[in-house]
């Protein structure tokens, strides 16, 4: 009788342990799924924000280009237009990153590629922020 009791208790302990392991695995997989879903949502929100920002920058750049287009330009304004055109090309290349990265990164190693994209981001944001700042400054001077 003791032997049957020991076997029964051992069986109950083993089945309880197996159920707890199975529950742990299910809860971990559910947590992984929830974390993955939340990361997707965050990426989606970030993508929408970047898309909106990119659209706004493109609109501002086009507006500045049309402002400078219909009048006689000085050498400084001509340089601003050249930088603005470069920014527009860079913004357009952001729409098709695969094609742009294929053209720009042939023959580079991974570190050089990372440095290239960091430099490209600085090259895009620097002139855009400068142009937007100077345009707003010019508008404020005209209004005031």
Swiss-Prot record:
BP GO annotations: defense response to bacterium; defense response to fungus; killing of cells of another organism
Distribution of this protein across tissues and organs: Expressed by the skin glands.
Cellular component per GO, a single term: extracellular region
Propeptide segment residues: 19-43, 73-122
One matching Pfam family: Bombinin
InterPro entries in the cross-refs: Bombinin
Residue stretches in coiled coil: none
Record-listed Isoleucine amide modification sites: 143
Keywords: Amidation, Amphibian defense peptide, Antibiotic, Antimicrobial, Cleavage on pair of basic residues, Cytolysis, Fungicide, Hemolysis, Secreted, Signal
Keyword Secreted listed: yes
Stretch forming the signal peptide: 1-18
Subcellular location, record wording: Secreted
Function: Maximin-3 shows antibacterial activity against both Gram-positive and Gram-negative bacteria. It also shows antimicrobial activity against the fungus C.albicans, but not against A.flavus nor P.uticale. It has little hemolytic activity. It possess a significant cytotoxicity against tumor cell lines. It possess a significant anti-HIV activity. It shows high spermicidal activity.
Family: Belongs to the bombinin family.
Listed name of the protein: Maximins 3/H11 type 1
């Amino acid at each position: 009788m003791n032997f049957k009791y020991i076997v029964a208790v051992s069986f109950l302990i083993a089945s309880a342990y197996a159920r707890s392991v199975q529950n742990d695995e299910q809860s971990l997989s559910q947590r992984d799924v929830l974390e993955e879903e939340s990361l997707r949502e965050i990426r989606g929100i970030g993508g929408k924000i970047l898309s909106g920002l990119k659209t706004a920058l493109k609109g501002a750049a086009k507006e500045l280009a049309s402002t400078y287009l219909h009048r006689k330009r000085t050498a400084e304004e001509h340089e601003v237009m050249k930088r603005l055109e470069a920014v527009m090309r860079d913004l357009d290349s952001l729409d098709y990153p695969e094609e742009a990265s294929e053209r720009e990164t042939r023959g580079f190693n991974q570190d050089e590629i990372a440095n290239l994209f960091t430099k490209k981001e600085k090259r895009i944001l620097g002139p855009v922020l400068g142009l937007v700042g100077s345009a707003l400054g010019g508008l404020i001077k005209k209004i005031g």
